[in-house]
From Swiss-Prot:
InterPro entries found in the cross-reference section: Metallo-B-lactamas, RibonucZ/Hydroxyglut_hydro, RNase_Z/BN
Species of the source: Cyanothece sp. (strain PCC 7425 / ATCC 29141)
GO MF terms held by the record: 3'-tRNA processing endoribonuclease activity; zinc ion binding
Protein name listed in UniProt: Ribonuclease Z
Catalytic activity: Endonucleolytic cleavage of RNA, removing extra 3' nucleotides from tRNA precursor, generating 3' termini of tRNAs. A 3'-hydroxy group is left at the tRNA terminus and a 5'-phosphoryl group is left at the trailer molecule
Keywords noted in UniProt: Endonuclease, Hydrolase, Metal-binding, Nuclease, tRNA processing, Zinc
NCBIfam families cross-referenced by the UniProt entry: PRK00055.1-3, RNase_Z
Family per record: Belongs to the RNase Z family.
Transmembrane intervals: none
The protein's role, per its UniProt record: Zinc phosphodiesterase, which displays some tRNA 3'-processing endonuclease activity. Probably involved in tRNA maturation, by removing a 3'-trailer from precursor tRNA.
Cofactor dependence: Zn(2+)
CDD domains: RNaseZ_ZiPD-like_MBL-fold (cd07717)
Length: 320
């Protein structure tokens, strides 16, 4: 699981930051899941290691232009390239009508099926590896945050130890690999976890924008490995944050702290903090770290790989 930030500015692009988009790269299945798709996202993709042909799912947080104005162009380009078999898009009410209107008035024909899912709080997608859920955030329009949870993977089965214990190969191996308890012909009871390496714990990611501090964001981000949270304003500009229902850097840090997240990436910065201004983005980082130390500033094309975690060492089983 790799995160690539394709746009980290709020509202409008700047010389160094495009508007919102984050790519979640899943190399094990040759897929990319996109979160938001602001203007020029496909241009950002061309400048990155993300492959347009691998985009399989797109998750839209809300209907403001800096999060959706790149969507129609990206979908059209995928069709012209001819190497996308299907696209699933998830987002708030109105997203489907928006895309239908764009397609109708531009007379764009998609050569592949597109399915738009109108989301509601709860689980919105699940397969054998991942679960994606969403919850409502607090913004001027309907907005949702997303959480991606990777399922735990069983540890490697120790065939050599199984042979040394005299366990016959066949169906018993399958049961033990699944962690089940089996009874051998001689009466010995073997527990599957005693022959398997520690499971790999599934990794978790939460994406929260646009929103002011809210309990929904805290709930969504519980115990995640990475929280990506908007930080449109500095703490001294909190009045504007409350007026526009955006977060300050300190609000984002408070969400991460309350949720016991492992790492926080700030994004969606107002252009008012660009280099040369009295208050700059580095000041937002200082504010956040005073509350939640493992905080980083996102920037365009930053890539971060979520680390894997193992459960405590398994109990060893002696031979003899």
């Amino acid at each position: 699981m790799q995160i690539t930030f394709l746009g980290t500015s709020s509202g409008v692009p700047t010389r160094s930051r495009n508007v919102s988009s984050v790519a979640l790269r899943l190399p094990q299945r040759a897929e990319v899941w996109l979160f938001d798709c602001g203007e020029a996202t496909q241009h950002q993709i061309l400048r990155s290691d993300v492959r347009l042909s691998q985009i399989r799912r797109i998750f839209i947080t809300h209907m403001h232009g800096d999060h959706i104005f790149g969507l129609m162009g990206l979908l059209a380009s995928c069709g012209l390239a001819g190497n996308v078999s299907r696209m699933d898009i998830y987002g708030p009410p109105g997203l489907n009508k928006y895309l239908e209107a764009c397609q109708r008035y531009s007379q764009t024909h998609f050569s592949y099926p597109i399915r738009v899912h109108t989301v509601q709080p709860g689980v919105i997608y699940e397969d054998e590896e991942f679960t994606v859920s969403c919850t409502a955030l607090h913004h001027r329009v309907t907005a949702f945050g997303y959480r991606v949870s990777e399922k735990d993977r069983p540890g490697r089965f120790d065939v050599q130890q199984a042979v040394a214990l005299g366990i016959p190969s066949g169906p018993l191996y399958g049961q033990l690999k699944r962690g089940e308890q089996v009874t051998l012909a001689d009466g010995r009871v073997i527990h599957g976890q005693q022959l398997c390496a520690p499971p790999e714990l599934g990794r978790k990611l939460a994406y929260c924008t646009d929103t002011i501090y809210c309990e929904g964001a805290v709930e969504l981000a519980q115990d995640v490995d990475v929280l990506i949270h908007e930080a449109t304003f500095a703490h001294q500009d909190a009045d504007m944050a409350y007026q526009r229902l955006h977060s300050t850097s300190t609000m984002a840090a408070q969400v991460a702290l309350a949720a016991a997240a492992k790492r926080l990436f700030l994004t969606h910065f107002s252009p008012r903090y660009a280099p040369g201004n009295d208050l700059q983005i580095d000041n937002l980082l200082e504010e956040a770290r005073a509350i939640f130390a493992p905080t980083e500033l996102a920037y365009d094309f930053l890539t971060y790989e979520l680390p894997r975690h193992l459960e405590p060492e398994r109990q060893t089983l002696s031979v003899g």
